[in-house]
Amino acid sequence: MQIIKRNGTTESYDREKIAVAIRKSFISTQKEITDEAVYTIVDEVEQFLHQNEANRSVERIQDEVERSLMEHGFYAEAKNYILYRWQRTERRKVLSQIITGTGDDTIANILKEIQKDFSGKEYSLTFLAEKFTSFCKPDMTSGERLAALVKAAVELTTQETPDWEFIAARLLNFRLTKKLTEQAEAAGIFSFYDKLRYLTDEGLYGNYILASYTPQEIETAAGFMCPERDKLFNYSGLDLLAKRYLIRTRSHEPIESVQEMYLGIALHLAMPEKQNRLQWVKKFYDILSRLEVTMATPTLANARKPYHQLSSCFIDTVPDSLEGIYRSLDNFAMVSKFGGGIGMYFGKVRAAGGNIRGFKGVAGGVIRWMKLVNDTAVAVDQLGMRQGAVAVYLDVWHKDLPEFLQLRTNNGDDRMKAHDIFPAVCYPDLFWRMAKRDLNQQWHLFCPNEIMTVKGYCLEDYYGEEWEQRYMDCVNDSRLSKRSMSIKDIVRLILRSAVETGTPFTFNRDTVNRANPNAHRGIIYCSNLCTEIAQNMSSIETVSTEICTEDGDTVVVKTIRPGDFVVCNLASLSLGHLPLEDEKQMKEKVATVVRALDNVIELNFYPIPFAQITNHRYRSIGLGVSGYHHALAVRGIRWESEEHLSFMDKVFERINYAAIAASSELAKEKGAYHYFEGSDWQTGAYFIKRGYNSPEWKALAVKVSTQGMRNAYLLAIAPTSSTSIIAGTTAGTDPVMKRFFLEEKKGAMLPRVAPALSDKTYWIYKSAYLTDQTWSIRAAGIRQLHIDQAQSLNLYITNEFTLRQVLNLYLLAWECGVKTVYYVRSKSLEVEECESCAS
């Protein structure tokens, strides 16, 4: 039996559709109806249909259902059924209105899907149609009308109706898919393999993908793609992906879908796998496309492309020589050229007024060199995309410290300023102890070159008690010139700069080096641009320079000792999207991302050879997290609570355990990192220092000692400012700044909504500026026990904070064992986000 639909087409009769509609009318009155009664009414409707062949329409069927309900005395249900019919009619009308307005019939299915998935009255498409109509103009093209429809959904997003952002994302994805289909048809692309061939021929894809996989393997991998996962994105995330990460043609048209991007990255990251490679492609694709893990911005942007620089950040130790300083500047320029940020340690460079080759008082000091760093950051602007990003670190005992602390402030001599770099200070325990005890005590500043000349050692090469003994030895040595200041004056300079500019960043060097699992191979002088990396460092040195003849030509050959030029390979677990209580699943997902990061080391395009050498010696990775506040909110856990501290203590211990176990299994499969022997991993000291003495931990320590570790360093919590937007979650381990706000981007106001915002989570999402910062610091201290590197910890202050209160936060961070502090964010201060480390 065929039924005539409203649009004139026919479909086969399905009695279950009538039964479902009848049951819905009873649900709304909270009455029960037996299946027998339901099908009695259905039978009556069917009897009518058999008797009236010429009038078998949807509308006539619904009339008969109403009549039958009333005949059986179900008057309230009949009324609800009539209301249901009216609502369906109104939904069809608004659907038709939007379709007519866009001039695109193909959007109907998306709109019906939206009506089904967002059934609340506040998400009625009537609101969308009204807003859309107000934007439409007669001379608009079809593309402009679709853009206006997306804009209408975006503007309907509020903290009371946050899901409009997901509706906007679906409409944006429809628009993107439509463009991609047009591009594919024009280019003769009919399969994923066709697309990779086209992108490779156009120089938009690295040829290594097609060289590594057969056409059959690529088509098999194409079957892994799940377009349904596009629905996981909110508008902000999808818009950011579309504008900055998806591959575009030379004419700037999109040529890659979101799922194709994730599969392309997965294909690239799985290339080093010798066995079950497609299985790893699928695992990598799944954790990325489900938004459970985000790779660092450079990996997300550059994997699968010809210039596949996948690392976020680098750290260089600037030596105290003209050649060395300019080499470091060159290193920075090359890193910046390929989209990386850098941390530079200037603690070895002689201070202003120091001696050069016996000439007294002629050294210009570190500020002059930092101005060159500043100009390099501005000049090498990453193909016009954004200027370079660099943090410069100086020890708190360096003679040039007072001027250094005023690099970015607005007062003082502009010739001594460098507004485009990010200063950071390295503190020993002694400084904080003295600051806590008595701010009026004297602190003494030295020139590192003078200490080396007079004392025969570099003070910065020591930490802890040995550093303190040598520092006091320098203080008491009359041969050394000292610049003495009260700790109060130094602290005042630090805090004023922090409140005014958000910097200097803080690096607690004794805390860092005591916990260094690879102290047998060196020392950690400083961190990176975002303060989450803590790895062994040493200067690059020229050993010799020779003039040689090669193929009849005269060439100059330099022999260079590569030092330890740190590389940051980052990814983040999206805690808000992960089953944190499911230990088995968490172990599997952590193991998958650890393997992916280890493969980054093999696959990376290195801007300078020193980075490649260090990366292969240590094989360091930085697995971090995002969605920290998100994870707390969906579980109803308040930030300012002991429950928060206890819960995250367990979570980070599990993550650490899973990461160590995964790295050890990789070592068994592929070999341990070069310097494993003698490390705290090998001796077991790593586990003893952290009090990991349960049977499970002890068994893991034995396994690590026997099997080795694939990676010298494992965990580091980056800020994730960009990639957390993509994943639709909260940034890093920060509390949200606001539950809802509008952000201006290129003349448009974009809504930013706290993830999973609802009546249940609204009060859990307390603003960072209203949150007691001592809870954030205590939480960071608890996490730090389980993190072998560091974390990007921001402090949020209001205009009511006194300098003493800010100092107390720094002291508490040091006392809690926090290794680094990133920005001090004042409500009146705009600070630049680091996109390089936005993993």
PLM region spans:
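Short acidic, glycine/serine/threonine-rich loops at helix termini
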Residues: E160-T161, R327, K348-V349, G354-G361, ...
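Catalytic alpha/beta core of large soluble enzyme barrels
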Residues: T214-T220, D230-D239, T531-Q535, L597, ...
